[in-house]
A protein has these predicted regions:
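Residue-level "contact hotspot" at macromolecular interaction interfaces
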Residues: 56, 73, 88-89, 96, ...
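Short, conserved secondary-structure segments in the cores of folded domains
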Residues: 53, 70, 85-86, 160, ...
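A short, N-terminal "cap"/entry segment at the start of jelly-roll beta-barrel domains
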Residues: 20-54, 62, 87-99, 104, ...
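Glycine- and acidic-residue-biased ligand/ion/polar-headgroup-sensing regions
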Residues: 67-85, 177-194
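Short acidic-glycine-tyrosine-enriched beta hairpin
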Residues: 84-102, 194-212
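A short beta-loop-beta micro-motif enriched in histidine and acidic residues
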Residues: 47-48, 58-73, 154-155, 167-183
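Bacterial N-terminal signal peptides
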Residues: 4-14
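Short beta-strand His + acidic residue motifs that chelate non-heme Fe in jelly-roll/DSBH
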Residues: 63-65, 81-82, 102-110, 172, ...
Length: 247
């Protein structure tokens, strides 16, 4: 009997030893949401710049915006946007304002409305007022030189919200096929350029011209969320995972 019991125990131990190991849970994925975008049939030869302004609208106030191609992003509150057709955007939402269009914006729900307005503009439009009530607009950033390597042709312009999970290592070195302007919404990102890493926190604006090889990671314990205002040649990936060829 003792021999049989020992044999049974050995059998159980053997089964336990051959049980398959549990598969570790998959790491949280990066999420990307296109807030708004459009296709630009032709850029022509006109040099173009990035510009971003903040827009503040008091409860019940109505303002008019008129500028080159741009995308609105709602930070807080809500806004009724009328630009050909009417729509209401709330926190995290956005709207495309096509070049040459005058848009009417009204703060909704009796609340203060705070937005960002990302612009792709020729030099002659950089200093033109964006709103009929200029006190509602504050410039946050503009590129000092035209976006490089934008050749005549068709391009895609969009604003994308990206979230990196906590503890995400830096991604492989890459560069833009066109250009991008980042805005950190929340969290702190690690931005590496030329082997040097800098922390980028909420409200930071980071310009990525064509050919700038860089990396992004999130070493923190909270998600990192940022906006990418991006332009790239139609049919070409916005991000190229390689070092650009030298001219």
């Amino acid at each position: 009997m003792r021999f049989a019991a020992a044999t049974a125990l050995l059998g159980v131990a053997g089964l336990a030893g051959t049980a398959p190991a549990q598969t570790p849970p998959a790491a949280p994925a990066i999420t990307r949401t296109v807030v708004a975008g459009t296709k630009l049939p032709s850029l022509g030869d006109t040099p173009l710049y990035f510009r971003v302004v903040s827009v503040s609208i008091s409860p019940g106030q109505k303002i008019s915006l008129s500028a080159p191609n741009g995308i609105l992003y709602q930070l807080s509150g809500s806004t009724e946007v009328s630009a050909g057709e009417a729509k209401t955007i709330t926190g995290g939402g956005g709207a495309l304002i096509a070049g040459g269009t005058t848009a009417s914006l009204t703060a909704g729900n009796g609340e203060h409305s705070a937005l960002l307005y990302f612009l792709l503009a020729p030099k002659e439009a950089l200093d033109q007022p964006v709103a009929a009530a200029p006190e509602t607009v504050k410039e946050l950033y503009r590129t000092t030189a035209p976006l490089p390597e934008l050749k005549p042709g068709s391009y895609e312009l969009n604003l994308t919200r990206v979230t990196f999970p906590p503890g995400m290592p830096s991604n492989p070195p890459h560069h833009r096929s066109g250009a991008a302007l980042y805005y950190i919404v929340s969290g702190i990102g690690a931005n590496t350029v030329d082997g040097k890493t800098a922390d980028r926190g909420p409200g930071s604006l980071i310009y990525e011209p064509f050919g700038l090889v860089h990396q992004w990671g999130n070493p923190g314990s909270e998600p990192l969320t940022f906006l990418a205002f991006n332009i790239n040649p139609e049919g070409v990936p916005a991000v190229v995972p390689e070092t650009p060829a030298k001219p």
